[in-house]
Amino acid sequence: MNNNWLGFSLSPYEQNHHRKDVCSSTTTTAVDVAGEYCYDPTAASDESSAIQTSFPSPFGVVLDAFTRDNNSHSRDWDINGSACNNIHNDEQDGPKLENFLGRTTTIYNTNENVGDIDGSGCYGGGDGGGGSLGLSMIKTWLRNQPVDNVDNQENGNGAKGLSLSMNSSTSCDNNNYSSNNLVAQGKTIDDSVEATPKKTIESFGQRTSIYRGVTRHRWTGRYEAHLWDNSCKREGQTRKGRQVYLGGYDKEEKAARAYDLAALKYWGTTTTTNFPMSEYEKEIEEMKHMTRQEYVASLRRKSSGFSRGASIYRGVTRHHQHGRWQARIGRVAGNKDLYLGTFGTQEEAAEAYDIAAIKFRGLTAVTNFDMNRYNVKAILESPSLPIGSAAKRLKEANRPVPSMMMISNNVSESENNASGWQNAAVQHHQGVDLSLLQQHQERYNGYYYNGGNLSSESARACFKQEDDQHHFLSNTQSLMTNIDHQSSVSDDSVTVCGNVVGYGGYQGFAAPVNCDAYAASEFDYNARNHYYFAQQQQTQHSPGGDFPAAMTNNVGSNMYYHGEGGGEVAPTFTVWNDN
């Protein structure tokens, strides 16, 4: 049996009751079938009538079988208005189920003909006083429909659930759509549904990574490393603990390595890492001397997730205007940041931070450089914070003695005792002549160094040859002291204030050139000049007077200084006169 067979039983239920309900002849009946209205030509006696009522439901059921498609979804047909409205009866109630299930003719649908529909839109009685709907309008409508729809309905595949909604409103939809447009629209909807791409696997997990502890930010595209610290997890807490941020990275591998290092610090070598444990042997040794928080802070500083102007050193930032480096230390001075100053290089700013960290946090402070670089004892004992120029002076005071200047260990406060002077060995260029000219008119006052005049105020030292057996004179207010070339010692030595220096038979000797720091203010700066003495001096008298002749000082390549470690080779450099 065909599934499209739909009908309503003829029941004489309250036949006489409905006889008195007669529809107005001026009413145009219509049914909304697939968006198109069909009008009753027999009821169109007055074409100017603007009142529209809904056609009875059986007609809509018949046409619904022709307009349904196998691929389309079920539609809810809206039967607007009531089946029959009594205009003159004020006591007429709203539409009832009996109006739709009243007396009618059985409807049977075939592919050849369509049965007649007995009765009009209003059930006026058995003799049908309202007129009948002609088949010409239905055939015209069926002629416009695709044949496939009718065939599909014949096969019984188009039977869908029917939903009738009763609405007391008398207004109808003014937008008229053709059935062809609806069919085309239905196909377009089906095609669009099929054309919609399904979400692929790649679209899921935009912030995930193939590495453990690494996520990719969906906005910036950078990789972030996080670690869940379950050591602070409270009892009864369902979460993993506290999330520790390890920094942002441009490369996924760098973020994965940062997670590995943090995991090794938190959970030891038994934890699971992204890369082999053998690649972190050096880092494992370094992290042993740091706490978890300190090591996490170091990982963050090494990341590329810092804001603009940040430095690789701890506590150092770059000023956005003048470009100089600023140093700050936090959690001091009332749990606030302490400004340490502005520096030309980030290394100097890092040193200032280290000094402040040592001052406030002692030996457990985390510094940018090795703590052995600083005089920790002096920093801790200092009443103030040695930052900037004060730190530089402290650094220079603690700097080891340069190798070119060998300072004697015996320091004497007496001006006549030269044991506290610095004995410097100076090597001069080969072939340079050193001339000492003595003025006959003014004894022991002027000297000439390669034609340059040294005033008597600069150096009051008197030199005399060994043949004259005169001692060199010294002024107690002068820098230079008596230098005697005595015959009691070997010809390869020179006596400086009673101390014999220059053993070994070399070509040149060193004389004290700088005084002690405590007595430096008492002497003129120009007296700190270097003087050389030849191993063998010969006196040559000029015809014009008793002037020492020019002597050539060919200094050897090896020179020793006299001190506790006598015999050690002193470094060489070139000395020039400051005048």
From Swiss-Prot:
<keyword id="KW-0539">Nucleus</keyword>
<feature type="DNA-binding region" description="AP2/ERF 1">
    <location>
        <begin position="210"/>
        <end position="276"/>
    </location>
</feature>
<dbReference type="InterPro" id="IPR001471">
    <property type="entry name" value="AP2/ERF_dom"/>
</dbReference>
<feature type="DNA-binding region" description="AP2/ERF 2">
    <location>
        <begin position="312"/>
        <end position="370"/>
    </location>
</feature>
<keyword id="KW-0804">Transcription</keyword>
<keyword id="KW-0677">Repeat</keyword>
<keyword id="KW-0805">Transcription regulation</keyword>
<dbReference type="GO" id="GO:0005634">
    <property type="term" value="C:nucleus"/>
</dbReference>
<dbReference type="InterPro" id="IPR016177">
    <property type="entry name" value="DNA-bd_dom_sf"/>
</dbReference>
<protein>
    <recommendedName>
        <fullName>AP2-like ethylene-responsive transcription factor BBM2</fullName>
    </recommendedName>
</protein>
<keyword id="KW-0217">Developmental protein</keyword>
<keyword id="KW-0238">DNA-binding</keyword>
<dbReference type="GO" id="GO:0003677">
    <property type="term" value="F:DNA binding"/>
</dbReference>
<dbReference type="Pfam" id="PF00847">
    <property type="entry name" value="AP2"/>
</dbReference>
<dbReference type="InterPro" id="IPR036955">
    <property type="entry name" value="AP2/ERF_dom_sf"/>
</dbReference>
<dbReference type="GO" id="GO:0003700">
    <property type="term" value="F:DNA-binding transcription factor activity"/>
</dbReference>
<comment type="function">
    <text>Transcription factor that promotes cell proliferation, differentiation and morphogenesis, especially during embryogenesis.</text>
</comment>
